[in-house]
């Protein structure tokens, strides 16, 4: 198993410096990770550094709360793609899901999917740590109905990250055709292999180098 191809090498902390972005870009080149996942501000730099490599540029939309307007999420998506992103990880409106406004949640997701269509993959962050089991299932079904490419567990900003149980539930809910991304607190090889065995097809982690080296990472992201 080529673990590097599963990993979105991630740096989303609010105090991220240019130096730390340069570092993850170089690590991504060296290990040929699936992507680097960075905040929108850094997309253009990462694209210019990675455009001649197999490493994709992934960014986040409506991050980390998901509570921006749909129009804002569309604008962010268009700007990210213009800057060179080919994968976007958008956060659902968790409050509307919990208010049983499923039609709004699906429409919000679909708007980003449509903006990205043909240009970028869309991954939908459902923020599992804030949801009941029923809400997790509903969120996954809404993302699937909206024709997103992936469902993703967590932002890493709301406490709690990916669990094997959640990955298994998400995989069972969306079936074999959608991607499932485990993100938040995945720090080592053992955790990564357990997530993949449970159904994850992508791993979001800032500990990518530690994972592929069989070491223990320290970050929550």
Swiss-Prot record:
UniProt xrefs under Pfam families: DeoC
Active site (record annotation): 89 (proton donor/acceptor), 152 (schiff-base intermediate with acetaldehyde), 181 (proton donor/acceptor)
Pathway in which this enzyme or protein is active: Carbohydrate degradation; 2-deoxy-D-ribose 1-phosphate degradation; D-glyceraldehyde 3-phosphate and acetaldehyde from 2-deoxy-alpha-D-ribose 1-phosphate: step 2/2
Keyword Lyase: yes
UniProt catalytic activity: 2-deoxy-D-ribose 5-phosphate = D-glyceraldehyde 3-phosphate + acetaldehyde
Annotated keywords: Cytoplasm, Lyase, Schiff base
Subcellular localization(s) per the UniProt record: Cytoplasm
Cellular component GO terms, alphabetical: cytoplasm
Gene Ontology BP terms: 2-deoxyribose 1-phosphate catabolic process; carbohydrate catabolic process; deoxyribonucleotide catabolic process
E.C. number(s) listed in UniProt: 4.1.2.4
Main location: cytoplasm
GO terms assigned for molecular function: deoxyribose-phosphate aldolase activity
Similarity-based family: Belongs to the DeoC/FbaB aldolase family. DeoC type 1 subfamily.
Function in brief: Catalyzes a reversible aldol reaction between acetaldehyde and D-glyceraldehyde 3-phosphate to generate 2-deoxy-D-ribose 5-phosphate.
Designated name of the protein: Deoxyribose-phosphate aldolase 1
Lineage: Bacteria, Bacillati, Bacillota, Bacilli, Bacillales
Annotated gene: deoC1
